[in-house]
């Protein structure tokens, strides 16, 4: 995704959307965990409202992350699970972030706009700076030298995770270029723990991509959703593809 000014957090990325190229105590003053607190809503396979956000889960979805913008580029990020037909709130971060230019309907999003797409998206896999851990989904990828998120509009690998050694995109373009791709190792803090969303899996050119759920940086994102480190770290081992996890972004 396009780069941000240095005072802002740069946004995230996306490896194999099902066939792509292959907590500190100080943070808790701004966030609130609500593990075990019940905030139950009737489950639905078509649409449900959780924390004021409209969620359109898949038929077998049992895990949801909601993102509710509270003001500007700030938001509340909550993890929910479904059991016996009811949705239960498990934990929440109040210091979530979205794009520096707010929210936008997905079909109106433009690459480099700094806007986060509204809607419900799958969470197909994760990546980060750490070696694979037993509790994480097997689809996890550890960032290695030469890994990029392709945002080159002329590449057939657009909006895909790819290593430059495999070619097929202009990885050498400078960050100032409209078709520059994102080198993942440039963001070790934000992408220490990062979860890919299925936004623009169809690779519509100029719509952008690299929309992730990742660790907070110093400010807003360039389109991703971010949350405190403790939240993402706690979420990672809980996500289970057999439970069809999704993220729902609203306001």
Residue map of PLM features:
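Secretory targeting and sorting signals
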Residues: 1-28
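Cell wall/extracellular polymer interaction/catalysis modules
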Residues: 34-221, 232-243
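Extracytosolic low-complexity repeat regions of secreted or lipid-anchored proteins
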Residues: 223-225
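Low-complexity, Gly/Ser/Thr/Pro-rich intrinsically disordered linker/tail segments
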Residues: 242-251
């Amino acid at each position: 995704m396009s780069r941000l000014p240095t005072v802002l957090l740069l946004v995230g990325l996306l490896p194999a959307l099902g066939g792509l190229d292959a907590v500190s105590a100080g943070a808790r003053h701004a966030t609130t965990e609500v593990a075990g607190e019940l905030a139950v809503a009737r489950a639905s396979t078509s649409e449900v409202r959780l924390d004021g956000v409209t969620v359109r889960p898949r038929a077998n979805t049992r895990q949801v992350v909601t993102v509710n913008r509270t003001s500007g580029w700030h938001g509340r990020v909550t993890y929910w699970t479904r059991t016996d037909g009811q949705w239960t709130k498990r934990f929440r971060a109040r210091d979530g972030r979205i794009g520096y230019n707010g929210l936008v309907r997905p079909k109106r999003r433009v690459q480099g706009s700094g806007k986060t797409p509204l809607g419900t998206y799958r969470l197909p896999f994760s990546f980060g700076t750490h070696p694979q851990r037993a509790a994480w989904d097997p689809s996890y990828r550890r960032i290695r030298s030469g890994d990029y998120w392709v945002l080159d509009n002329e590449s057939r690998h657009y909006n895909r995770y790819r290593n430059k050694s495999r070619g097929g995109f202009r990885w050498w373009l400078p960050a100032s270029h409209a078709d520059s791709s994102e080198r993942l190792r440039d963001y070790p803090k934000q992408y220490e723990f990062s979860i890919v969303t299925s936004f623009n899996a169809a690779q519509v050119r100029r719509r952008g991509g690299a929309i992730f759920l990742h660790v907070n940086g110093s400010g807003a994102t360039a389109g991703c959703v971010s949350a405190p480190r403790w939240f993402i770290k706690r979420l990672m081992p809980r996500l289970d593809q057999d439970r069809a996890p999704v993220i729902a972004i609203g306001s």
